[in-house]
């Protein structure tokens, strides 16, 4: 990985992209320390110190790079964009017009879907900004005095500041995707989690020595396991029939169709977490973080939450896999190019076989993601001190996954540059 970064730095084009990505992330981090007006940051910090470790807000805070607990302009982070992406992608399957736009619209259709996602992000940012303001207002009425000035105008300024921040995060992510390295939103999320590590270390050192050893060994084992699964793939053998065109013979070679075990990446975990944490987030925003339903169903440390979380991960893994792999299209492409899978006729039998393989991989990949994501919940229920750690299986999956994807993107661009040099 370090060697890849070193080699990429020597290439002027990639060096510019790396510097641009770092520049955008720097802008994001600067925005993460600019507080919105009419909020007492000191009182807010005292309040969050008492609730972050015991509610879902601690996870939100880690995902936002601690901007959430400081009520900064970028406090909402990437959450509105992620929720908007979930809504639009589900509607794309449910509404035929959107499905046609996504599949048959080409580049224009893709741009229209992106534009709809942007508008939805702003709408959700406005809604979540209002919810965050109401949470601060509710706790201000309980004696915390977080909001320094009451009234319609201060409320409007606070909500619009949060909304503008969510739109800015979306725009920064798009700039990284277009002009930088890797997926912009993933890079921002990666930077947020990395920036939360010092605070996690501070919490870690408060544990008993044997708990520290277990946590460190667990994280290392988790990283190695994630790296192994990310590189694992099922290869379906493909043969091409020989074709004679004039005096030349084409085809006849053997190749394979690689299907990655972790084909859907980290998105099922991120989406499942957004959906499952919604009730607990509403409870946290309204201040109702107690009671039977919250403790036994909505709380992220409950077993019911763990089961629902696992089911949602399985659903989104299947959902993303169906979007990524159109087995009928793959079968038709093989048939038109003279390719076939040994033992299966071209057409429907080939499509059915590929779908059968993908279904098996989806089950394994979903179980893998579910186990990794649920390990922190299980560890937190077995060891009380570990529950206060903001880092979890989701965070480790995101950090490792984004790092591997970034390295692969750099390697692909370096390889492309070598091909360009050869052709030139």
Model-derived regions, located:
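N-terminal cationic and glycine-rich segments that engage phosphates or anionic surfaces
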Residues: 1-424
């Amino acid at each position: 990985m370090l060697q890849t970064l070193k080699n990429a730095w020597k290439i002027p084009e990639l060096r510019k992209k790396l510097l641009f990505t770092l520049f955008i992330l720097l802008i994001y981090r600067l925005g993460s320390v600019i507080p919105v007006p009419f909020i007492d940051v000191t009182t807010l910090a005292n309040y969050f110190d008492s609730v972050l470790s015991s509610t879902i807000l601690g996870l939100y805070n880690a995902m936002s790079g601690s901007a959430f607990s400081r009520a900064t302009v970028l406090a909402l982070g990437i959450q509105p964009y992620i929720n908007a992406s979930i809504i639009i992608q589900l509607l794309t399957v449910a509404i035929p017009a959107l499905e046609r736009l996504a599949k048959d619209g080409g580049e224009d259709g893709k741009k229209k879907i992106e534009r709809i996602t942007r508008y939805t992000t702003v709408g959700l940012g406005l809604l979540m900004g209002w919810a965050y303001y109401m949470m601060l207002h509710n706790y201000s009425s309980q004696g915390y005095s977080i909001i320094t000035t009451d009234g319609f105008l201060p409320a409007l300024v606070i909500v619009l500041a949060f909304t503008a921040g969510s739109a800015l995060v979306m725009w920064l992510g798009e700039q990284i995707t277009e002009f930088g390295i890797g997926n912009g939103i993933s890079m921002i999320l990666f930077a947020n989690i990395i920036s939360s590590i010092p605070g996690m270390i501070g919490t870690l050192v408060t544990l008993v020595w044997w708990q520290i050893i277990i946590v460190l060994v667990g994280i290392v084992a988790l990283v190695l396991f994630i790296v192994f699964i990310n590189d694992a793939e099922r290869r379906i053998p493909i043969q091409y029939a020989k074709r004679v065109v004039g005096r030349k013979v084409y085809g006849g070679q053997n190749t394979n169709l690689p299907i990655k075990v972790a084909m859907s990446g980290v998105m099922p975990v991120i989406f499942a977490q957004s959906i499952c944490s919604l009730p607990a987030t509403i409870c946290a925003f309204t201040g109702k973080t107690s009671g039977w339903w919250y403790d036994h169903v909505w709380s992220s440390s409950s077993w019911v939450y763990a089961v629902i979380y696992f089911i949602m991960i399985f659903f989104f893994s299947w959902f993303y896999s169906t979007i990524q792999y159109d087995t009928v299209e793959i079968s038709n492409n093989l048939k038109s190019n003279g390719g076939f899978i040994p033992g299966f006729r071209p057409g429907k039998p080939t499509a059915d076989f590929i779908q059968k393989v993908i279904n098996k991989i989806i089950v394994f990949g979903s179980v893998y993601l579910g186990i990794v994501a649920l390990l922190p919940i299980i560890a937190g229920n077995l060891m009380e001190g570990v529950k206060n750690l903001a880092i979890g299986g989701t965070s480790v999956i995101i950090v490792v996954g984004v790092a591997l994807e970034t390295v692969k993107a750099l390697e692909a661009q370096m390889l492309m540059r070598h091909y360009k040099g050869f052709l030139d």
